[in-house]
Amino acid sequence: VGTPDLRLIDRCVEACTAAHQRLLAVSDGLTDADLRAPSLLPGWSRGHVLNHLRRNAHGFSLMCEAAGRGEEGLQYPGGMDERNRGIEDGADDPAPTLVANLRASIYELEAKWFRGDGTMWMGSGVLGTGATVPVSDVPYRRLREVTVHLTDLDVGISHEEWPDLFVRMELDRQKMAWAASHPMGLTQLPARAMELPDKLRLAWLINRARVDGLPDGPGL
C-alpha cells in the first residue's frame, strides 16, 4: 500500500457523508409497503437494497477497524455466502427497524473514518470478492455503493444527479477496466459511447442506462 492521498480521502469522505444523508432522508420516507416493492435490481426489493447498504457499511467498518490495529481485516468474515445471507436476513424487517439499523451502520462507519489515524489509512483489507484493497480506497468505494444504489431504489434519483467526483473517478476506473478486458485494437470505448455526456456514459458502462446503438454496458 502506497502513501494515501489524504486530500482525496477528504473529498471522498465529504461526498460520501452527503450521499449518506440523502440516503437517510429518502429511507425515512419509505413505508413497509414501499420497502416490499421491487427495486431496479432483479430479484431485490427496496428492502434488500437498504439492507445491503447497511451490511456493506458494517463490512467496511470491520476493514477500517482491523487496519487501525495494523491487521488486514475481512469485509465479510464468512465470505460471499455471509454477504448474501446478510442481505436476506433483515430485508423484510419493518421500515423503522431497517432504517434504524441502516442509520447505525452509517454512523459506525463514519466514526471509523473520523477517528482514523495514519495506521488505519495506510492499511489494507479484503473485500467479499477476495480482492485486497487499500483502506484509503474505502470512502470512494462506499460513495460508489451509496450513489448507484440510490438510483437502484427507484425513487426518482437518476444518474443525472450523481456527484461529479464520483462520475470523474468511476469513469477513469471503468475506462481502465474496459481497456484491460479487450484485445489490442479494441481498448477504446465505442465511438457512440464517447459521444455521450459523462454521466450517461458512466450509467451505460455500469449497466444503469441503455443507449440506442450500443449493447448493454459491462456493469459493475
Feature names for model-found ranges:
Residues 3-7, 40, 86-94, 130-133:
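Short coil/turn segments at secondary-structure junctions
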Residues 20-28, 57-61, 103-114, 147-150, ...:
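Structural signal for well-ordered, non-membrane alpha-helices
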Residues 82-105:
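A short, structured beta-strand-centered segment in the mid-to-C-terminal lobe
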